Regions:
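Compositionally biased, proline/threonine/alanine/serine-rich low-complexity intrinsically disordered stretches
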Residues: 1-41, 285-307
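Active-site beta->alpha N-cap acidic-glycine motif
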Residues: 40-149, 159-168, 175-176, 250, ...
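Active-site-proximal beta-strand/loop segments in catalytic clefts of secreted hydrolases
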Residues: 84-88, 111-115, 138-139, 180-184, ...
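Alpha-helical scaffold elements lining the catalytic groove of polysaccharide deacetylases
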Residues: 93, 140-171, 185-231, 244
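Residue-level detector of anion-binding/catalytic polar loops
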Residues: 107, 133, 200, 207, ...
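Short low-complexity, flexible loop/linker segments enriched in glycine and/or proline
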Residues: 124-127, 149-152, 217-220, 277-281
Length: 307
């Protein structure tokens, strides 16, 4: 049985209603940091799911979420899920994920890699413009539990903070005070550092392991089997993966048929960047001239003779 939330758990919730009510908040959030309203309009997309709730999280002191690692806060009701996507933004796949979500009037949390956002800022902006939550997944997705980061906390902090600065620059505005560690490895010293920064750490309840899969059917089967077992949860997928992007429309359809509901999580306050790392990012941009992109994302064969 999941423990009951303590008083410090998320408190402000927006419900799915048919329309606005007197005094309802109407302000929209800054890019990457949506502001919850007092209600959620019904989905106007044919067959779309629509959001069930928006949950605002007070990240003071760096709470942890996701029962795979953190047991204290259980804010989801039966058959509720939070959709999270790691490792974007990425061409083709991230836009396909965005379309599937838009077709269902849903919002998700994107834990983006800072370096990827510098390569594809236009896609990061699309994620923010659609009202999704943007959060950091480090600068270059290094496992911070391994050396050199495990033995050099300053280098590990740089990997965290450069990711935050890069996302902030890519979307030209604030992002949420959420963070997910690469490989879900949580060094205690870095958890303490995030707590000092008032950044919440997200693990998962349902890990799709979609990075091991090449077919959309495999992704769907993995998620649904685990969801049926647990009944609810924070779901980890990757918008970097083509199979996931291809699977999402059918997966959302199965969610709806199964009576599952999607919750959008937002942070009460955006994360602030640190000037030291903003300056490091600016200096790196001047020196790198984007030469760090992988060959496959730069050079494409578009024609060759038949043999």
């Amino acid at each position: 049985m999941s423990p009951a939330p303590s008083p410090a758990a998320p408190e402000r919730v927006a419900q799915n209603t048919a329309g606005p009510t007197p005094g309802a908040a109407t302000a929209t959030g800054a890019p990457g940091q949506p502001a919850p309203t007092d209600n959620i309009a019904l989905c106007d997309k044919p067959g779309g799911m629509g959001l069930s709730r928006i949950v605002e999280i007070d990240t003071t002191g760096g709470p942890g979420f996701g029962f795979e690692h953190f047991k204290q806060y259980d804010f989801l009701r039966d058959k509720e899920v939070v959709l999270t996507f790691d490792d974007g933004p990425w061409p083709e796949n991230t836009p396909a994920v965005l379309k599937a979500l838009a077709d269902n009037c849903l919002k998700a949390t994107f834990f983006e890699i800072g370096e990827h956002a510098t390569w594809h800022p236009e896609i990061a902006k699309q994620v923010a413009a659609a009202g999704h939550t943007i959060a950091s997944h480090t600068w270059s997705r290094k496992d911070l539990a391994k050396n050199p980061y495990a033995s050099d906390i300053e280098q590990a902090k740089q990997e965290i903070e450069m990711g935050i600065s890069a996302l902030h620059a890519a979307v030209a505005g604030p992002i949420s005070s959420f963070f997910r560690f690469p490989a879900l490895q949580h060094p205690p010293a870095l958890l303490s550092y995030l707590a000092e920064r008032n950044i919440a750490t997200f693990s998962t309840d349902i890990d799709s392991f979609d990075f091991k899969m090449h077919k959309p059917e495999q992704v769907i089967d993995s998620v649904m089997r685990k969801l049926e077992k647990h009944g609810k949860g924070i779901i980890l997928m990757h918008d970097f993966q083509r199979a996931t992007a291809q699977a999402l429309p059918e997966l959302l359809h199965q969610f709806k048929d199964g009576g599952y509901k999607v919750v959008h999580v937002v942070s009460r306050s955006p994360v602030t960047t640190l000037s030291k790392y903003d300056e490091m990012l600016a200096q790196q941009d001047k020196l790198s001239v984007n030469n760090s992109r992988p060959l496959s994302s730069v050079v494409h064969t578009i024609g060759q003779p038949d043999h």
